[in-house]
Each structure stands twice: as structure tokens, then as C-alpha cells.
């Protein structure tokens, strides 16, 4: 069949005959994605988000509650090994995102499509692979990726609800003992109030209104507000940390190998934003600048992670707690950190919700008439919000259950699938042995994250089953 392949000059396109696998021909004819215009023609859109808006969303997609647990993670790795490992993980995560974008752009050119999401890219990668079995089961690639994305992103939404309720509850319960003066290096909870589940329900109306925002350009306002509130809170934390940095000579450069898996499991999921990469690229006015924005955004995030993780461990040493906010004095300045994070996470919910909504809602809307499209759209959004709130309320130790599920889905999405996708995408064009080796090593690293995270979550679930019920904890979930 004949498709259009862009030449070096953007004004010239030459026809190229490709011998496509039979399964690829079927997928191309059945795929519901728009096919009018090539990727180069659609790279500039009259309506879309700007480069700055894309950067804001990208930074917000990465910067969640996980950064508060990184000082403890650095403790489990060592004051030298921890920051170095964070740097390596940031580079690998960024590289895998670039792989996904390149493969998606490759199939856009090859199949003359304006855009592709994560699931479509994997599906076409399998369809063009040299293996007949993979070609015949290419549709399962899209289904598996969509399932992982839905589970991961809605899982984050569930944990965000728990985080919102717990932090607001801590501030309210400590209000009688919170002072203006910041001397005591401790956050205490003295006055019991209503159950945290009632706090969760109190956020439901606000979250319901937020998810009704369906435009990424409008969501930029909320992402920008979230970034500002979180950055201000991190500045407050940082200025307290650097006031009194003790001698670091007593801290181990490299911690015990027995505790390093705890660092690995915490850190690897802090870089989880691959689910929003292609939706952001697809919505850009000029997608050609996306790789630069992606590198800039991940550089900002990695630098923040290393700074907070290393400085937090340097300041508090072995006394560092699971969330660095628990090491702050019980005064209004540092209690405001929790309130700022509540605002930030509240705004972040809508962005994390955007990905599963874009997968589920179009499938449902396609089954009804145009008259009912909007009511069905809004109803599904409201139902999904209620579902995340219900799961947050009903499931004991939700953080461990989601860590178990995330160990599989997050590792697969961020580290296992992208390098394997690169191999099957470029295999027929003579991919170098060095690239294959690099991709294999990254996939092995992702599989290690899956094994370590699964073991850690199962171990904690077993321990929690033999102890009194504990409140949900969110410091290890991004």
C-alpha cells in the first residue's frame, strides 16, 4: 500500500511503498484516529497549548507527594549513593519518555496520522514487528497499556484524596498547640477531630467540579497554581533545612545493600509521569519543540528531587521521618507547608484524572448519539471521582495496595515497555547491537523495580495484617 513519508524538506513529500504486515493493514483501516494530514502538517495547530503551558503540566505531572519521602529514601541509599542514584534514574526516565515520543512520531509519519497515544503506539509497534505472533495480537498491546494507564492514574487520584484528608486533619488537630514561634522541632497532634473519612467526603464536591474542566489550556491555570504552591512550600522547607546543616562526615556515603531496595522502590515511582507525555505532545500548538521542553522539565524535576532528598537527610540525619513535614517545627509558618501542599495536590488531581478520562470517555461517548454525548461525558467523570473517593475510604492500607499494583503497572509503563517498543519499531531498519543492549538493560532495571516493589508491598501488607489498623500513608506515592 502507499503511504506518505516526509522528506528532509518539510515542503516536499515523496510516496513510498511499504510492504506492511497484513495485521498492520487491518489495524490501519480499523483505527479510529484521524488520518487527514501528516504529523508534520499537524505539528502546528491553530488551537492547542503553548510550550510554557506544556512545561507547567509536565513539571506538575512529576512533582507530587513523593518528593516529601525522598530524604528518607536517600538515607536508605547513602548520602553519596542516594543523589547519584536519583540522577541516574532521572536520566533513564527522561530517556524512556524520549523513546516513546520518537516511536509515536515514527508511526505518525509511517501511517500518515496526525497523532498517536501510548496505546496506539504500542499497538502499531507490535503490528510492524518481525514476529507473526506479536503481529496477530497487536490489539492486546493497546488494551494492556490502556489498562495500566487507567489503574496507575486513578490510583494516584485515590492516594491524593487520602493525602488531602490526612494533611488537613493534621493541621486542624494541631491548631490548639500551633504557635507563632518556631523552636520545637516536632509536629504534634493533640486534639482529636472528626474521622479522616469525613474529610475525604468534604473534598468530593470540589474534585467533582475540577474534573468537569476538559480543556488542557484551562487546566494550565490549575497546574500553575499547584506548581506555585508546591514550590513555595519546598522553599519554606529548604530555608529551614539550610539554617543548620550539621557535619556530614558521620553519615554513610553508601548505606547497607539491605536498605537500598527501599530507596529504589521509593525513588523509581517518583519519576512516574510517562502517562501524560503523549497527551501533552498531542495538544501542543507546535509539537516540534516538545523534546526540548521534555528535557528541560525533567531536568528541573531531577534537580529538585536531588536537592530536597540530599539536604533533608543532611539536616536531620538518622532522625529523618517518612515525610519531611513531620520533622518541621509545630508553628504556623511550617504548618502552612501542609496547607500549601493541600492546595497543590487538589489542583493536581484534575491533571492526573485527565489521562484515564481520555481513554474511557471517548469509548462510551461513541456508543451514544451526539445529543447525549455531553451528559454521558460529565456523568462518567463524576462517577470516576466518586469511585476514587470510595476506594480511598473503604480499602484499608490503600497505600500498600496501590504500591503493589503500581509496582507492576508503573514499572511496565515507565521502564519496561518503552525500550522494548524501540527495538520492535526500528528492528527492520537495522537497529544497532549497542541500542539493543541499552534497551535490554533498561527493561531489566524496570523488571527489578517490579520485583522489589512487589516484594516490599507484599511484605508490608503481611505485616500490617498482623498489627492494628493503620491510617493510609501517601509519602511513597507520587
Curated annotation (Swiss-Prot):
It is found in: Cell membrane; Endoplasmic reticulum membrane; Recycling endosome membrane. The keyword Cell inner membrane does not apply. GO terms for molecular function: amino acid:proton symporter activity; glycine transmembrane transporter activity; L-alanine transmembrane transporter activity; L-proline transmembrane transporter activity; proline:proton symporter activity. GO terms for cellular component: endoplasmic reticulum membrane; plasma membrane; recycling endosome membrane. Residues 1-46 are annotated as: Disordered. It catalyses: glycine(in) + H(+)(in) = glycine(out) + H(+)(out); L-alanine(in) + H(+)(in) = L-alanine(out) + H(+)(out); D-alanine(in) + H(+)(in) = D-alanine(out) + H(+)(out); L-proline(out) + H(+)(out) = L-proline(in) + H(+)(in). PANTHER family: AMINO ACID TRANSPORTER, PROTON-COUPLED AMINO ACID TRANSPORTER 2. Belongs to the amino acid/polyamine transporter 2 family. Electrogenic proton/amino acid symporter with a high selectivity for the small side chains amino acids glycine, alanine and proline, where both L- and D-enantiomers are transported. Extension of the backbone length, as in beta-alanine and 4-aminobutanoate or methylation of the amino group, as in sarcosine and N,N-dimethylglycine, are also tolerated but decrease transport efficiency. A free carboxyl group is preferred. This is Proton-coupled amino acid transporter 2. It comes from Mus musculus (Mouse).
Amino acid at each position: 500500500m502507499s503511504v506518505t513519508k516526509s522528506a528532509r524538506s518539510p515542503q516536499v513529500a515523496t510516496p513510498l511503498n511499504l510492504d506492511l504486515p497484513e495485521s498492520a493493514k487491518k489495524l490501519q483501516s480499523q483505527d479510529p484516529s484521524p488520518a487527514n494530514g501528516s504529523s508534520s502538517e499537524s505539528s502546528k495547530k491553530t488551537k492547542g497549548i503553548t510550550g510554557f503551558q506544556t512545561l507547567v503540566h509536565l513539571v506538575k505531572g512529576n512533582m507530587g507527594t513523593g518528593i516529601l519521602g525522598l530524604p528518607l529514601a536517600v538515607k536508605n541509599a547513602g548520602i553519596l549513593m542516594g543523589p547519584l542514584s536519583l540522577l541516574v534514574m532521572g536520566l533513564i526516565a527522561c530517556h524512556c519518555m524520549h523513546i516513546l515520543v520518537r516511536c509515536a512520531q515514527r508511526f505518525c509519519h509511517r501511517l500518515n496520522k496526525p497523532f498517536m497515544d501510548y496505546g496506539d503506539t504500542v499497538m502499531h509497534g507490535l503490528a510492524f514487528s518481525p514476529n507473526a505472533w506479536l503481529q496477530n495480537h497487536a490489539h492486546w498491546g493497546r488494551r494492556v497499556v490502556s489498562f495500566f494507564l487507567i489503574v496507575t492514574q486513578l490510583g494516584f487520584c485515590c492516594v491524593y484524596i487520602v493525602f488531602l484528608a490526612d494533611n488537613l486533619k493534621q493541621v486542624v488537630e494541631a491548631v490548639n498547640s500551633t504557635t507563632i514561634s518556631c523552636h520545637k522541632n516536632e509536629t504534634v497532634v493533640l486534639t482529636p477531630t472528626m474521622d479522616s473519612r469525613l474529610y475525604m467526603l468534604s473534598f468530593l464536591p470540589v474534585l467533582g467540579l475540577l474534573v468537569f474542566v476538559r480543556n488542557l489550556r484551562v487546566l494550565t491555570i490549575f497546574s500553575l497554581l499547584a506548581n506555585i504552591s508546591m514550590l513555595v512550600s519546598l522553599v519554606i522547607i529548604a530555608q529551614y533545612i539550610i539554617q543548620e546543616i550539621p557535619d556530614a562526615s558521620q553519615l554513610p556515603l553508601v548505606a547497607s545493600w539491605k536498605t537500598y531496595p527501599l530507596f529504589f522502590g521509593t525513588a523509581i515511582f517518583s519519576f512516574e509521569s510517562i502517562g501524560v507525555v503523549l497527551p501533552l505532545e498531542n495538544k501542543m500548538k507546535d509539537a516540534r519543540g516538545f523534546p526540548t521542553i521534555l528535557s528541560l522539565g525533567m531536568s528541573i524535576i531531577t534537580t529538585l528531587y536531588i536537592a530536597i532528598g540530599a539536604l533533608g537527610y543532611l539536616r536531620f540525619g538518622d532522625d529523618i521521618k517518612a515525610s519531611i513535614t513531620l520533622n518541621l517545627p509545630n508553628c504556623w509558618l511550617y504548618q502552612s507547608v501542609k496547607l500549601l501542599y493541600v492546595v497543590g495536590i487538589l489542583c493536581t488531581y484534575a491533571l492526573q484524572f485527565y489521562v484515564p478520562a481520555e481513554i474511557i470517555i471517548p469509548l462510551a461517548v461513541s456508543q451514544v448519539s451526539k445529543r447525549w454525548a455531553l451528559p454521558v461525558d460529565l456523568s462518567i467523570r463524576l462517577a470516576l471521582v466518586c469511585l476514587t473517593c470510595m476506594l480511598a475510604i473503604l480499602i484499608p492500607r490503600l497505600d500498600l495496595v496501590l504500591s503493589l499494583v503500581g509496582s507492576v503497572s508503573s514499572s511496565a509503563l515507565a521502564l519496561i515497555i518503552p525500550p522494548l517498543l524501540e527495538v520492535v519499531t526500528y528492528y527492520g531498519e537495522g537497529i544497532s547491537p549497542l541500542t539493543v543492549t541499552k534497551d535490554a538493560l533498561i527493561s531489566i532495571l524496570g523488571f527489578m523495580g517490579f520485583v522489589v516493589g512487589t516484594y516490599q508491598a507484599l511484605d508490608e501488607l503481611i505485616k500490617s495484617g498482623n498489627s492494628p489498623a493503620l491510617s493510609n500513608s501517601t509519602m511513597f506515592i507520587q
